[in-house]
Amino acid sequence: ASAAGLLTSLPSATYAVSKHAAIALAEYLSIRHGDDGIRVSVLCPQAVDTPMIAGRTGSAAAANDGVISAQALADCVVEGMDAETFLILPHPQVLTYVERKAKDYDRWLDGMRRFASRLSGKVGR
């Protein structure tokens, strides 16, 4: 999945929705099959230094929270799976963002609207 599935990535609706769906599927599998001894983990990184982000400038996640290497991501995955952690967050600050979102959804939506306006170059609001 991606942090985009927890926090709604901008500007791509299809990317955000598909990542939300991946997290929902992982939750479902964990709920339905956890008692069968099946462990499910979902990986939710922000920016990772891969060809997918090569050449992109202005990535909000990369600018704010940094880009991690593929090796650091792999290490985080192994550590999370060894610990049987459901939610693997290579960028630990994502948990803070999710907690803020859950605490006051309306405030989070307002903040995301302002953020979207800044990304698109709109002034005001």
Please annotate each region the language model reported.
Residues 2:
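Residue(s) in the substrate-gating loop at a strand-loop-helix junction
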Residues 7, 28-38:
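Active-site-adjacent segment of SDR/Rossmann-fold oxidoreductases
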Residues 7-14:
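Active-site loop immediately N-terminal to the catalytic Tyr-X3-Lys motif
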Residues 15, 23:
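Catalytic tyrosine of NAD(P)H-dependent dehydrogenase/reductases that use a Tyr as the general acid/base
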Residues 18:
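Active-site helix of classical SDR
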Residues 45-55:
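Short, flexible catalytic-loop segment of classical short-chain dehydrogenase/reductase
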Residues 64-125:
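C-terminal tail/cap regions
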